[in-house]
Amino acid sequence: MFKPVDFSETSPVPPDIDLAPTQSPHHVAPSQDSSYDLLSRSSDDKIDAEKGPHDELSKHLPLFQKRPLSDTPISSNWNSPGITEENTPSDSPENSATNLKSLHRLHINDETQLKNAKIPTNDTTDYMPPSDGANEVTRIDLKDIKSPTRHHKRRPTTIDVPGLTKSKTSPDGLISKEDSGSKLVIVMVGLPATGKSFITNKLSRFLNYSLYYCKVFNVGNTRRKFAKEHGLKDQDSKFFEPKNADSTRLRDKWAMDTLDELLDYLLEGSGSVGIFDATNTSRERRKNVLARIRKRSPHLKVLFLESVCSDHALVQKNIRLKLFGPDYKGKDPESSLKDFKSRLANYLKAYEPIEDDENLQYIKMIDVGKKVIAYNIQGFLASQTVYYLLNFNLADRQIWITRSGESEDNVSGRIGGNSHLTPRGLRFAKSLPKFIARQREIFYQNLMQQKKNNENTDGNIYNDFFVWTSMRARTIGTAQYFNEDDYPIKQMKMLDELSAGDYDGMTYPEIKNNFPEEFEKRQKDKLRYRYPGIGGESYMDVINRLRPVITELERIEDNVLIITHRVVARALLGYFMNLSMGIIANLDVPLHCVYCLEPKPYGITWSLWEYDEASDSFSKVPQTDLNTTRVKEVGLVYNERRYSVIPTAPPSARSSFASDFLSRKRSNPTSASSSQSELSEQPKNSVSAQTGSNNTTLIGSNFNIKNENGDSRIPLSAPLMATNTSNNILDGGGTSISIHRPRVVPNQNNVNPLLANNNKAASNVPNVKKSAATPRQIFEIDKVDEKLSMLKNKSFLLHGKDYPNNADNNDNEDIRAKTMNRSQSHV
């Protein structure tokens, strides 16, 4: 950058290229204006020697330019205008903002006007004319100033955004354990059946997706656990009578015990946000909660979130859902309904809504987002919470997610790029509008049926249908056959694929061979790894730029089709399924398949539709043919285990064979057609169908394990296995449940063993009609399946042989050659 100078010799003449455009080379004859400087140079040698080497170096540097040549050229039309609506003076040195004192003298002539003048804050607020004693030195006793190092170590810091900020205490942008001032406690307030659990689950899901680790701490769970351990009888409505001193004392104890668990999670654990889920309907309770928090930490931010529901129909719907909750599970519905209404009346006696004179930071949601009141909001996380809560709705809608049709880069195996569709991709693009139009019609018919059945459907039930694409040519080409009058199309930069930076256009083998160290870094931590070069991104970068898309999806009441790319589709599916970041990077999003998501009050239901090139149609893949894994959801109620069924790539994902489902469909078109018809016409919102399996082996994950760096917030390795033998979709949340247990297969082709379940093993199990099977028979069948799977795993580990697969051996070779592998994908 700087040239070394030998001060013992005469400085060499620098070449012309090293000089600024405004300078002249030393060997060029000086102008008349500079002759005096040359004549007096010898007389100033002594002074120059005293100035030191820095001044000597400055003689050979280009002139400093406040606006370098890399800035916008002077001739640009985008310079600041000389005259604005406020009649700003021209930008000469005399009239610029650096000479504000002269501007005041031009407009204000006498002392009276000067005293009474109102100066605009955006122009001269920071300017103060010097006083008569401006030249006097004011001495300040430094002992009276508190040094920053003397503050408490848990002082709040500025904004932390995972993946976008970096500091000494937070190298990855996550809120550090020591920075308790940036953490948030959300205290729920409201009567039962007003939507508090719905709000907390959605809010927790959004915060965890944003990598602000959040958990819900439910006082009701503490009450039930205490009653079970101490043999207390069931708490009926009389237990919640405000005048019952004994029960009130117990309920206060349970509340404080739960709050202590929350504070331990924030102050001693890795949590950033803790949600205290309780009624907290009295001023006294809220005062005690705030005092307990301040006793543990004076720096934690506290936000009270009150849910008010004035919609009688919505309250009645929530009450019916409560009958399936843990307090009334397995009891007589009629007596349970009567008891819960009596409990609600007791809570209403002591209910005191939050008021401004309590001097709390609070949000009041009325009818689950129809009206939102925010008061005294402080802190970054609190403001993000308000922003998210403004985008709630309960409308029935569908969210369709698919990748672009097959592109030229998909065929060559190159990542990134902006290639166009292949002929096969164009066929998919032409068939997609017809499929979506049919599904839109079926969805509308189901809404009409709900209205006839008086299922609290709004008057205007006809949904618009939007199509969103990225700005890459392959997604735009996939949407080109949609009629924009019926399907408004919008291109979004946020939906672009993860940028590979310098590696854009390369294949994975090329990256591995040419940059083995970078390839290994990404294999170890795909979530945090950012591709080198300008524009290179990581999964965390994609997650951050998708936040506006997430909030818009939560806000709109219409259906939408998102045509995007693999990483973006993974991130969107991970949000709606409430998955850990370590799981998102392994979701299966094959080409020419469409995911359908339907938000529900208790979670999300999803299905997968696969394009059959031979018949030029789409078919819904039965759950028995899906490669799925059950994984534990994150950020929900503390000490509760909830699971989502997620799509995962099969061991044969890298093969060139067609999917088993399409192969069987071609071999037996009659049964496949009837199956498709039944799937298309079956009613939506069928709770009985979603809760059909209560004896299912679950494959979950323990998200509290620590990685090699001792950090338990983002696991770097695959999750652990966990099992559970009971599940209720209304109680447990999550996605729709398959009535068949996923089969676990050994690690093959470098596929994560937890995320590669082979359902083909089900073909070796006798087919039992579910309608004729009793719960006991289903339980026995699951036991046999589990033992069979264990024996096959053991056989593979001992002999190193793959499972026999007759279906693949019987496939037609012509079909293999013509059919694209639906899991062919990159990035």
UniProtKB/Swiss-Prot annotation:
GO terms for biological process: fructose 2,6-bisphosphate metabolic process; fructose metabolic process. ATP binds at G190, L191, P192, A193, T194, G195, K196, S197. It holds the Pfam family 6PF2K. This is 6-phosphofructo-2-kinase 1. The keyword Iron-sulfur does not apply. Residues 42-59 have a biased composition (Basic and acidic residues). The gene is PFK26. The keyword Ribosomal protein does not apply. The modification Phosphothreonine is found at T157. InterPro entries: 6Pfruct_kin, 6Phosfructo_kin, His_Pase_superF_clade-1, His_PPase_superfam, P-loop_NTPase.
